[in-house]
């Protein structure tokens, strides 16, 4: 393998990792995999899938605090936790301003059964609203792991879920030039 000819900093005089292209190609690969799997959209809750499709990092301390609705033929919608939403909007300018939403979460049942059911109902209503707005309500929708409260609320709202994990694994299986260069850079740093 050739030596890595660039470092971690960004410069205007060398072709290095192109992060705009990285984000664009990752989303395109995901959308192609969703289409191939016959999915109109996917509700993604797993950190690695949100990161892959939106390039967003966030809190990792509890499941389903945030989620992304990634469409096969439209731009993704990001549902973000509380005040984190405002900070993400400032820095993640590649997500369209109209595609940010506040997330609904129920913290694995900590608030109690009635609160969980109500929050899951609001979650499902928000998802259904966006599915209808994009013309895919009633089509096959994938997920990479929504808990029972979320699944039940979506089913009650008429959303039938199937696994999006095969499509996500397919999308991530073949690396782009920028993904390979990210891996090479990480290896170069760790081999010092």
Predicted regions and their residues:
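A composition/biophysics-driven feature that prefers long, compositionally simple stretches
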Residues: 1-189
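N-terminal glycine-rich flavin-associated loop
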Residues: 192
């Amino acid at each position: 393998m050739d030596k890595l000819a660039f470092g971690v900093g960004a410069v205007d005089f060398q072709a290095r990792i192109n992060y705009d292209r990285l984000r664009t190609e990752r989303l395109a690969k995901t959308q192609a995999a969703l289409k191939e799997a016959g999915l109109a959209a996917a509700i993604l809750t797993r950190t690695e899938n949100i990161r892959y499709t939106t390039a967003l990092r966030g809190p990792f301390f509890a499941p389903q605090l945030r989620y992304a609705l990634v469409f096969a033929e439209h731009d993704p919608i990001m549902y973000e936790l509380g005040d984190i939403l405002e900070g993400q909007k400032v820095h993640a300018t590649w997500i369209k301003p109209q595609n940010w939403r506040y997330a609904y979460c129920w913290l694995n049942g900590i608030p109690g059964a009635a609160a969980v059911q109500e929050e899951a109902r609001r979650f499902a209503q928000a998802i259904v609203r966006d599915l209808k707005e994009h013309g895919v309500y009633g089509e096959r929708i994938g997920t990479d792991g929504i808990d029972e409260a979320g699944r039940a609320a979506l089913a009650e709202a008429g959303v039938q879920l199937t696994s999006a994990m095969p499509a996500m694994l397919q999308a991530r299986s073949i690396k782009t030039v920028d993904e390979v260069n990210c891996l090479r850079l990480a290896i170069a740093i760790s081999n010092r």
